[in-house]
């Protein structure tokens, strides 16, 4: 749903120059959808650079929505920063208990969101015009694919007899 926005962000360099954990957090804004009936907590960003990048992505999304509206096209979903802190913490190597502490998100929802994020980061790793961004995206995906997230990928596999 955010393909055009992601492509524009890549073209504008909004995903460039970030460390893997911050890139994971920023890219999570394209995949995460707040589903709780309670309002989301205020977003957390690890640095002023990450906060500013999110704001630039948000401005670009708003501009894209305005153009889509004028053209009577379906609107691109706006980015949501509600998973930024969790993605950043998990990519930085924090324990699952610490990541989910004080969060209104089940372990299963965390894993589902992490897997969607890993998939998108791998795609960014393939298409990012900046080689450093492509490499950082691949590293971020690798850093997210651990613990319960990687274990959930082998559950249900059948061993041939």
Task: Give the label of every model feature segment.
Residues 1-161:
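Non-catalytic terminal extensions of ATP-dependent helicases
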């Amino acid at each position: 749903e955010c393909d055009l926005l992601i492509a524009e962000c890549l073209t504008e360099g909004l995903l460039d120059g970030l460390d893997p954990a911050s890139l994971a957090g920023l890219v999570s804004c394209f995949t995460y959808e707040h589903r709780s009936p309670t309002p989301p907590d205020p977003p957390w960003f690890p640095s002023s650079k990450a906060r500013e990048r999110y704001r630039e992505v948000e401005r670009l999304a708003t501009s894209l929505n305005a153009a889509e509206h004028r053209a009577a096209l379906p609107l691109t979903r706006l980015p949501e920063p509600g998973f930024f802190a969790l993605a950043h913490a998990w990519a930085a190597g924090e324990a699952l208990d610490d990541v989910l502490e004080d969060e209104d998100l089940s372990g299963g929802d965390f894993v589902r969101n992490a897997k969607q994020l890993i998939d998108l980061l791998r795609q960014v790793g393939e298409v990012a015009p900046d080689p450093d961004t492509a490499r950082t995206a691949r590293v971020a995906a690798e850093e997210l694919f651990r613990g319960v997230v990687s274990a959930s990928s082998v559950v249900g596999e059948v061993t041939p007899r």
